Amino acid sequence: MKKWIIFCLSALLALSLAACGGKETGAAWTEDSLQAFLDSGAFSEELEELDADILWPLYRLEDAGLSREQLDSARAFRSAGATCEEVAVLSFTDEKAAELAADALKDYTAAQIDANRSYRPDEIPKLENARIDRRGSTLLLLVAADQDAAAQLLK
């Protein structure tokens, strides 16, 4: 009986420690990731590439407390105006900067919902289902028409 109790307590301890391990965040988002989303059929139209210098004010990253030097690289594709679809991958100098940027992207998405509620109401579900995913010091912003196609790449 004593051995059984020790075994059960050991198993419980092992399970507790495994639970503390946290969720694996996966590999960093890259330009290859971005291209995979573009090729996935998740968008209802062909998206146009935005200049990286446009992304800084568009996403209001400075308002989030970031400096331009903290953004290592950025690449984004966006609808020319017919839809609210877009995909962006941003890479920062550290995880804290990426956390701040994730908050800025949440604010950006909320502002897009407000701005498009009466103008393009059919786009609101896409914006409400927008994905902002941080992996280390990289971020993905995804506003897609086909969430199922996009979900396959988010795994």
Where are the language model's segments positioned?
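Positively charged n-region of N-terminal signal peptides that target proteins for export
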Residues: 1-4
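C-terminal motif of bacterial Sec signal peptides marking the signal peptidase cleavage site
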Residues: 15-19
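Bacterial signal peptide processing site
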Residues: 21-24
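Short, compositionally biased low-complexity segments enriched in polar/charged residues
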Residues: 48-85, 96, 100, 127-130
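Second-shell loop/turn segments in exported
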Residues: 76, 86-94, 138-143
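Short, conserved charged micro-motifs
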Residues: 95-103, 148-152
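Short Gly/Thr-rich strand-loop-strand
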Residues: 98-135
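A short, solvent-exposed beta-edge/loop patch
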Residues: 122-155
